[in-house]
Curated annotation (Swiss-Prot):
Binding-site positions, D-glyceraldehyde 3-phosphate: 173
SUPFAM superfamilies the record matches: Ribulose-phoshate binding barrel
Originating organism: Halobacterium salinarum (strain ATCC 700922 / JCM 11081 / NRC-1) (Halobacterium halobium)
Catalytic activities: aldehydo-D-ribose 5-phosphate + D-glyceraldehyde 3-phosphate + L-glutamine = pyridoxal 5'-phosphate + L-glutamate + phosphate + 3 H2O + H(+)
Transmembrane domains' residue ranges: none
NCBIfam families named in the record: PRK04180.1
Gene: pdxS
InterPro entries named among the record's database cross-references: Aldolase_TIM (IPR013785), PdxS/SNZ (IPR001852), PdxS/SNZ_N (IPR033755), RibuloseP-bd_barrel (IPR011060)
Binding site for D-ribose 5-phosphate: 32, 161, 222, 243-244
Name this polypeptide is given: Pyridoxal 5'-phosphate synthase subunit PdxS
Active site location: 89 (schiff-base intermediate with d-ribose 5-phosphate)
Taxonomic lineage from the root: Archaea, Methanobacteriati, Methanobacteriota, Stenosarchaea group, Halobacteria
Family classification: Belongs to the PdxS/SNZ family.
Length: 302
């Protein structure tokens, strides 16, 4: 059995170690939480980790303004409350927010488009940190650029806070389709693809040879029901992030437990039917097609 020291070493250190910690979350559900009470509920219903932020994405959309890193005291309080990993969000390009999150003990940092970007041109150099990072991607080029910067986990961007899974599906299909195309290319064609998509050529070749991303790939953005979670697992995701879909639901405990069960039984329709029954209404959603262009969080970062 791993000791507390062993787990700490798995969380922090070399690229291999950081990727290893991220891989430990594979097959699980990571839930957004804004306080200790929500974190405790998430742990009780089976989340493998929680993501702390000052407001869930749906509420960030409603209130507008600048969305920033949560109060570090919120994260430390949650760390004291639960035994599962606790993650925190920083703004894209905001190195100091990431340094603060690392300093207070975040197990992983999400350089997230859900928050207002601090830098429109550059992401954080994640290789310089000991804490692992997760980043969003809409396509394979974005995913490989984030991995080259040091991301230990990729997630679909989707369209957070909408309750509409459409864009998460689209992004996952984009990534899988591009990988299949790379697998059918020869060495020179892969080099050309890397140039055309501004992707690191070594990672392009590694991805083609593996037939998948070299890091774990989770689904995120608009996942609001057990069926949504099962769908993303069907499309080959390694796990699920759920934001507004849990605590925006009528019965967060029932919804959270159902999403976890759906991930574990995503290939069993009869079991999924049982899981999805009598859990209360899900969050109120907004179709992605109705979003004004300036409200599309997925377009932040490149």
């Amino acid at each position: 059995m791993a000791t507390e020291t062993d787990l700490e070493e798995l969380r922090r250190g070399s690229e291999l170690v950081k990727r290893g910690f991220a891989k430990m979350q594979k097959g699980g559900v990571i839930m957004d939480v804004v306080n200790r009470e929500q974190a405790r509920i998430a742990e009780d219903v089976g989340a493998v980790a929680v993501m702390n932020l000052e407001a869930v994405p749906a509420d960030i959309r409603k209130r507008g303004g600048v969305a920033r890193m949560a109060d570090p005291a919120s994260l430390t309080g949650i760390i004291e409350e639960v035994s599962i990993p606790v993650m925190g969000k920083s703004r894209i390009g905001h190195r100091k927010e990431a340094e603060i999150l690392q300093a207070v003990g975040a197990d992983m940092i999400d350089e997230s488009e859900v928050l207002t970007p601090a830098d429109d041109e550059y992401h954080i150099d994640k290789r310089e940190f000991t804490a692992p990072f997760v980043c969003g991607a809409r396509n394979l080029g974005e995913a490989l650029r984030r991995i080259d910067e040091g991301a230990a986990m990729i997630r679909t961007k989707g369209e957070a806070g909408t309750g509409d899974v459409n864009q998460a599906v689209h992004h996952q299909r984009n990534i899988k389709s591009a990988i299949r195309k790379l697998e059918g290319m020869d060495y020179e064609e892969r080099d050309m693809w890397a140039r055309d998509h501004e992707a690191p050529r070594e990672l392009v070749h590694e991805t083609a040879e593996m037939g998948r991303l070299p890091v774990v790939n989770f689904a995120a953005g608009g996942i609001a029901t057990p069926a949504d979670a099962a769908l993303m697992m069907h499309h080959g995701c390694d796990g699920i992030f759920v934001g507004s879909g849990i605590f925006g639901a009528e019965n967060p405990e029932a919804m959270g437990r159902a999403v976890v069960d759906a991930v574990n039984n995503h290939d069993d329709p009869e079991r999924l039917a049982e899981i999805a029954s009598n859990i209360g209404e899900g969050m109120q959603g907004d179709p992605n097609a109705d979003l004004p262009e300036d409200e599309r969080m997925q377009d932040r970062g490149n």
